[in-house]
Structures are given as structure tokens and as C-alpha cells.
Amino acid sequence: MSILKNAPQPELIPTYDGSNQSTHPSVLQFDTPWNGYRFWMAMTPYPFNYDGLEDPSVLASNDTKTWVVPDGLTNPLTPAPKPGHNCDVELVYNRDCNELWLYYVEADDIVQSWVKLMRSKDGVHWTKPEIVLHDPVQKYSILSPCVQRMQDGTWRMWYVDTGNTGYQNQSNKVRTRTSEDGLHWSAEETCEDLSQPGYQIWHLTVWHDP
């Protein structure tokens, strides 16, 4: 049973490719405007299921209805790798340094994958991608990373391990890691079985409610 009804019509989310077909939004809300906006979103285009344009993009809003590219920013933040594709953005506010941190997945679609991080002090100027996780032997083992800052200041990441077969994998697992700084992560642990008969674990989100 659905808790919330679907919206009568989708919101218009502009994408750099002009399709306005976006996926995997990650939205932050601020009590007062942060660099001019109360809401910041990371997302990727995904026109007609084409992952070649699934590159990290950032938008901002003050009402969640009208989303704009902030002045001075050009999407995407980083282009698609060759070979492979980007996907699965996660936007986090780091209160220690007053920065937006954007995690995303890069897969070469051959044998390996990475979680990379870009940082910004104003939402417009972003650092070059840096590697925070790397799997050299499985191309889809770190999908849909979700990062939360815990009350004690530590970080925690959850993601879906689909091995080398992606969404067709029938034994997907949810993994988790911890970190002291959001950059260096512990060895992974497997969460307790979250499988449901007839369903596959795919994209997820986690929200910490203290």
C-alpha cells in the first residue's frame, strides 16, 4: 500500500541534454538559504533509459517547484567516462566545512567500479572527482550509495551490491560501511536480509532520524 499518492503531474526538472528526463534525485533542505537557495538537488539525466548521459548535475530552488542551474554553474559536473558511465548521485551537507559533498558511481561496464566525490563551498565551483571506494573486480558492486552523517559525527554509507550483473541479479545485497571523515571508509558489512519474495533490491535511500 502506498503511503503517499503520486503527484498529479511530474515536476519539470531541467537537464543539460534538454530531455528533462531525470533520475535518482538527492535533495537537501536548509532552514535558511545556503548560497542563495533553500533547496539543492543532485540528479542525473536518464533519457529513455540511456545511461550514457547519466552524469552528475546540480540544481537549486527556493520552493521545490522551480529548479534552476545556479549562475556560474555548467552541468554536468563531470562527463561520462570512456568506456563506461556515471550514475547514482548522493548529495550531503558537511557542516564541519560548510560544503556540499556529492558522491556518485562510475562503472567501466567491463570489470570495475568506483565511488567518487566532488566538493563545493558555494554549489557552483566543484573540486575534481576523487576516489573514495574502488572495486577492481566487479562492475556493479557499489550501486546507489546513500550517505548519512550520524549524531556522533561519524559517517555511514549504504549501497546495493549487484555483482557483475546489475539489475538482473537475483541475489542483490545491501552493504554498509563507516567513516570518520567521509573520505576513508571501513571494510564493508552485509546488512541483515532485506529481500522480499518477488522483488529485487535496487536503488535505495536511507534517512537518519535522531
Where are these regions (language model features)?
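Beta-rich carbohydrate-recognition and catalytic domains
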Residues: 1-84, 92-143, 148-202, 207-210
